[in-house]
């Protein structure tokens, strides 16, 4: 009897993981079936930007805001990369993607004001509140996990630090979805962190254990201190979060190869309603034209892990010059892979970009009025842009 139960449980587990296990074979670099539906595309600022995981579009201004962290090559809490030595920090940038007018095409770093820990700034998710011109940024600082809050002057392109948000439930924050100027959901991508329990974190990832969390936070409107905090959902590898509509929250489940859809209850609790199964591992989710999910992620987990572990060698000329022949060959032969798809209730899932010309895709954004799209890469140089 016990053996029967064990076999049944194992069969159920393997079935639930079959599409992810299949991706290890079907999406390997030599087998990945590539596609690119974008005709007029360009990688911009490859000589100035690297490792820009997330971005937001301010469509009325035709302005993209992104955070780029070259230090991710040596410090990645999610993937367990910890290389000793000097660690560069992240910066905030504004890209004016207009095709005409003052400043069109310019990339400008924000001047950071009043941020005492600016050298310990290692960014992941971004969320912007237009009503108060406030930017929320998840920060995997060496000093501990936190959310940084900045007031932006979009004319002067300054970012004045307003607060650092910490809380016992903010353990490994990844993505943010605002519900108002002082209310938000935050995803914690793991329960076990690679800093404190590397083996357990790896087991949690590869078995897709539903231990990661989505936390609801209510903040004080004057100083952003936490008034209330509670876990409202648990799932495997909670990554990007986005409101599909007023009553539905989408949460990427990276290690499960899926996006979970939740009903948002009146008290901000979440009730799981359905799962979107994917042929790749999703990173971030965004909304296109108010009704379609843009899902961005990684085709092949083993390749992504290898790519992440090699960046501190491949992107540092001095280290690369002193590297072994094997390491240099790895840098030349290890591609970054990307997968972008869109999903809607009406049309289902449709892949729109499966490529290695721009790798490690993490976020895709679309401004339909301007006919402008952008992909940001977790471990890539520059921003992939296209126009229609």
Question: What is each stretch, according to the model?
Answer:
Residues 11-20, 279-351:
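Loop/turn-rich, solvent-exposed surfaces of beta-rich toroidal or solenoidal domains
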Residues 22-50, 102-114, 158-159, 226, ...:
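A short helix->beta-strand "capping" segment at the edge of beta-propeller domains
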Residues 41-90, 125-126, 358-363:
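Beta-strand-rich domains and repeat architectures in extracellular enzymes and scaffolds
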Residues 49-58, 115-130, 166-183, 191, ...:
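Beta-rich, blade/repeat-based domains predominating
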Residues 58, 64-74, 135-142, 184-195, ...:
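Conserved beta-strand positions in repeat-built beta-propeller and related beta-rich domains
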Residues 66-87, 138-140, 187-209, 298-334:
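Short, conserved, GDST-rich strand-edge loop motifs in beta-rich repeat architectures
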Residues 70-135, 139:
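Blade-loop segments of beta-propeller domains
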Residues 301, 361-388:
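Blade-level signature of beta-propeller repeat domains, shared across WD40, Kelch, NHL, RCC1
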């Amino acid at each position: 009897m016990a053996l029967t139960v064990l076999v049944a449980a194992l069969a159920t587990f393997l079935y639930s993981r079959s599409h992810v296990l299949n991706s290890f074979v079907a999406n390997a670099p030599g087998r990945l079936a590539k596609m690119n539906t974008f005709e007029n595309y360009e990688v911009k600022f490859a000589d100035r930007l690297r490792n820009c995981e997330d971005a937001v579009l301010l469509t009325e201004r035709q302005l993209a805001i992104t955070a780029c962290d070259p230090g991710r090559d040596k410090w990645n809490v999610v993937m367990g990369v910890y290389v000793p030595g000097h660690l560069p920090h992240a910066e905030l940038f504004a890209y004016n993607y207009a095709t005409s007018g003052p400043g069109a095409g310019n990339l400008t770093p924000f001047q950071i004001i009043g941020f005492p820990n600016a050298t310990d700034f290692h960014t992941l998710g971004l969320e912007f509140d237009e009503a108060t011109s406030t930017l929320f940024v998840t920060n995997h600082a060496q000093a501990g996990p936190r959310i940084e809050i900045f007031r932006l002057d979009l004319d002067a392109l300054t970012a004045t630090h307003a607060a650092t948000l910490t809380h016992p439930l903010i353990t490994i924050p990844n993505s943010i979805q605002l519900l108002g100027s002082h209310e938000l959901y935050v995803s914690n991508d793991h329960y076990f962190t690679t800093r404190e329990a590397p083996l357990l974190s790896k087991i949690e990832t590869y078995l897709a254990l539903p231990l990661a969390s989505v936390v609801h936070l209510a903040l004080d409107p004057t100083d952003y201190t936490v008034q209330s905090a509670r876990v409202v959902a648990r799932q495997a590898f909670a990554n990007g979060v986005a409101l599909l509509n007023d009553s539905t929250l989408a949460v990427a489940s990276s290690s499960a190869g899926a996006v979970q859809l939740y009903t948002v209850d009146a008290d901000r609790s979440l009730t799981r309603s359905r799962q979107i199964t994917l042929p790749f591992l999703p990173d971030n989710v965004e909304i296109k034209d108010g009704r379609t999910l843009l899902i961005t992620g990684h085709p092949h987990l083993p390749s992504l892990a290898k790519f992440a572990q090699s960046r501190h060698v491949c992107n540092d000329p001095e280290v690369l010059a002193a590297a072994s022949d094997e390491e240099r060959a790895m840098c030349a032969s290890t591609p970054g892979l990307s997968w972008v798809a869109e999903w809607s209730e009406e049309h289902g899932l449709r892949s729109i970009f499966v490529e290695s010309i721009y790798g490690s895709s993490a976020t895709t954004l679309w401004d339909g009025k301007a006919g402008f799209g952008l992909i940001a890469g977790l471990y890539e140089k520059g921003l992939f842009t296209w126009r229609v």
